[in-house]
Amino acid sequence: MKLRGLVVLILAAAVFSAPALAAPKRADPIKMFDTDNDGTLDLAEVKKAASALFAKLDRDHDGTLDAQELRGRLSAKELAAADPDHDGTLTLDEYLAVVEQRFNAANPDKDGTLDAKELQSPAGRALLQLLR
């Protein structure tokens, strides 16, 4: 009877730990985007990453991103606020303006760089949504 209980316990542990083990880890954003290797991200590095993602997301190559291309990176309300001409799309400049706003929100010490701790904050995670 004890052996059966042990087997059940081991199987339960395996079942419940499998999803955690199978879940892919996200790459370290500092390592991904820190082109000068100083251990932080500055606005230029963030904008470079955002520009690259913009080009990748712009599947129809019209120079804008609509809600479908943004794939949930911005809520409808955020998209409307970031869209000064109210055409339902963001140009690269409009997208980078949102990126800069989120960068500034994630940089409470105003030192011009984001470290790992700042990127883990809610504002930092919101910024990372626009880079990945």
Each PLM stretch: what is its role?
Residues 110-127:
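A mid-sequence interfacial segment
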Residues 34-38, 58-62, 85-87, 107-111, ...:
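Acidic carboxylate motifs that coordinate Ca2+ or other divalent cations, activating on Asp/Glu
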Residues 1-8:
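Bacterial N-terminal signal peptides that target proteins for export
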Residues 21-56, 67-81, 92, 96-102, ...:
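EF-hand Ca2+-binding helix-loop-helix modules
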Residues 8-17:
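Bacterial N-terminal signal peptides
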